[in-house]
Amino acid sequence: MSELRSELKYLESHEWARVEEDGTVTIGITDHAQEALGDVVFVEVPEVGSQVSIGEEAGVVESVKAASDIYSPVSGEVIAVNEALEDAPETVNSSPYDDGWFFKVKPDDLDELEKALSMEDYKAAIESDD
C-alpha cells in the first residue's frame, strides 16, 4: 500500500500539496504515482517567477516506463523549485513527500485547495482504480 499523509491535500491526477507555515504551498507527486511510474529519470518543473494555474500543466515527470504531466493544485507564483532533482531525479522515488518535492507556490487564493482531496478521499480514489 502506498504511503499517504494526513496533512497533505491530493489531486486525482496524483499530485500532493502541503501548506507551509508561511502560507506557501509545496507540490510533488504521490507515493502511489512514483510506484506506478517506476524509476524516475527526469523532472521538468516551472521556472521561479512563472505563474501556474489550478488544474493546468506545470511540469513533466519522466520514468523508464512513461512520461506524465504534473498539474498545479493552486494558482500563483512559483517561488522555488527543487533543483536537486536535476541531478538526482530518483529522489522522487525514494522520498516523494520530503526531499522529492517539485516546486513551491505563493498561492493567489489558498481556498483553491478546498477542491483537493483529503487523504481518505484520495485513498478511496486510488483503491477504486486498482
From Swiss-Prot:
Transmembrane segments: none annotated. Gene3D superfamilies: 2.40.50.100. Pfam families: GCV_H (PF01597). SUPFAM superfamilies: Single hybrid motif (SSF51230). Keywords: Lipoyl. It comes from Saccharophagus degradans (strain 2-40 / ATCC 43961 / DSM 17024). GO terms for biological process: glycine decarboxylation via glycine cleavage system. It comes from the Bacteria. Belongs to the GcvH family. GO terms for cellular component: cytosol; glycine cleavage complex. Residues 24-106 form the Lipoyl-binding domain. The glycine cleavage system is composed of four proteins: P, T, L and H. This is Glycine cleavage system H protein. Binds 1 lipoyl cofactor covalently. The glycine cleavage system catalyzes the degradation of glycine. The H protein shuttles the methylamine group of glycine from the P protein to the T protein. PROSITE patterns: BIOTINYL_LIPOYL (PS50968), LIPOYL (PS00189). The modification N6-lipoyllysine is found at residue 65.
